[in-house]
């Protein structure tokens, strides 16, 4: 009937900020942020892995340092053999090997730091990688950086876990790219921007990566942003997650502050047309 019930077991770990299920559905990985925002500021941030048992309970498998304290998000590359982690407060990203048979996490194989800033002196004084994910069809990986208004593009060596930069995609100043989703059947990606309330539609070239083809404002045109409490009353937008329906027919953008979800119809070329708001 869709109701939820606890399994009865509670696993305690310091400040788990992100949960990601492996594509084989056998393991769950958590990243742990150690910062003043979580109240646990000492030590080194890490990732932990758990085996998902038949009754839904979790059995801890391993922990591994990510090389930084500010872990924000994590995903798996298309092979399922590498964990891609953002280090929001350290301005970088990390790649860690993952064994899909045992659930064990290896030591960091790549950990580049980003450079630069954006026009917002509070939110963009330094780089802030927020999303890091792999292309579903190639070995390209992308890091959305809220602090620099760029999507950093890399080629992942799926033998060694090394990263080779292949360029950056610059978005509008002050946009604050937060995350990205891939269309399930089109070679199109959607970058949701937190600071200016937009989604950027990008075509994907298998070698060159992203090319922006459309930008849509997701808040009502007459909405005056009142600002999130952490924005010090400066009146920004505070866009949150963006996602696609399972069939790729619709794109959804969460409009924080306005407390709504913007719904867009996805066209045959991947471009968006506003449909409704809920």
Give residue ranges: language-model regions.
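Asp-box/WD-like beta-propeller blade repeats and closely related beta-sheet repeat scaffolds
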Residues: 59-131
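Short loop/turn segments immediately following beta-strands, especially the blade-tip
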Residues: 1-2, 50-56, 95-106, 154-162, ...
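A short beta-strand motif characteristic of beta-propeller blades
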Residues: 5-11, 59-64, 110, 116-122, ...
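Conserved beta-strand positions in repeat-built beta-propeller and related beta-rich domains
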Residues: 30-34, 39-41, 85-88, 135, ...
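Residue-level detector of Asp-centered blade-edge/turn motifs that repeat once per structural unit
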Residues: 23-25, 78-80, 135-138, 184-186, ...
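Loop/turn-rich, solvent-exposed surfaces of beta-rich toroidal or solenoidal domains
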Residues: 235-270, 275-278
